[in-house]
């Protein structure tokens, strides 16, 4: 009897997880964002976000930070849970060379509507906490990276070369926006991850 109850409980948990996963936005197809494969400079307005500050290797602390962000975000009322109004998560790190990844001070964020003014209690875990913030933009240079996160360097170099060739210089942190990546239950195919790499830039007079 106990074994049967345990099996039922496990099935319920798996089913609940599957329902959540099925309801999550899948991200765009490569065809929908193909225009981003070439670097470009655009104007972006400020974005209200849920934000977590976390120091350490993004491959380790990033999972915890995004887990807390998602838990907080999907517990809020009045935020889009899917559709065209849903905006994917993003993160920022310093761009100085020579800083070990363990020393990176990352900002992990989930965009929210400007009308959101408070997030309530229960938005903290494991020494991390969620806060409301506004990310400033202005002129930005960006490019789409297709594939694994650890294979981004050539794409980053293309974007940085483009910035210099257009008479601009980087102003601010390295930013990534995760259009398509690992899901809650399954990692997916890393070779098909879609990531926008972005820098705030200013004209180099």
Each model region followed by its residue ranges:
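A solvent-exposed interaction/effector surface
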Residues: 3-205
């Amino acid at each position: 009897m106990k074994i049967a109850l345990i099996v039922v409980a496990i099935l319920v948990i798996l089913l609940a997880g599957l329902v959540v996963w099925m309801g999550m936005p899948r991200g765009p197809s490569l065809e929908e964002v193909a225009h981003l494969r070439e670097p470009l400079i655009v104007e972006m307005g400020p974005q209200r976000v849920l934000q977590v500050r976390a120091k350490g290797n993004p491959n380790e602390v990033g999972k915890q930070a995004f887990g807390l962000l998602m838990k907080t975000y999907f517990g809020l009322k009045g935020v889009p849970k899917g559709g065209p109004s849903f905006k994917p998560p993003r993160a920022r790190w310093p761009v100085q060379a020579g800083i070990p990844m363990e020393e990176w001070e990352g900002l992990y964020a989930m965009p929210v509507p400007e009308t959101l003014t408070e997030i309530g209690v229960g938005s903290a875990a494991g020494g991390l906490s969620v806060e409301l913030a506004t990310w400033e933009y202005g002129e930005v240079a960006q490019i789409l990276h297709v594939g694994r996160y650890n294979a981004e360097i050539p794409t980053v170099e293309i974007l940085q070369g483009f910035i210099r060739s257009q008479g601009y210089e980087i102003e601010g942190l390295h930013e990534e926006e995760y259009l398509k990546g690992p899901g809650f239950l399954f990692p997916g195919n890393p070779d098909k991850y879609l990531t926008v790499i972005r820098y705030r830039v200013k004209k180099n007079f």
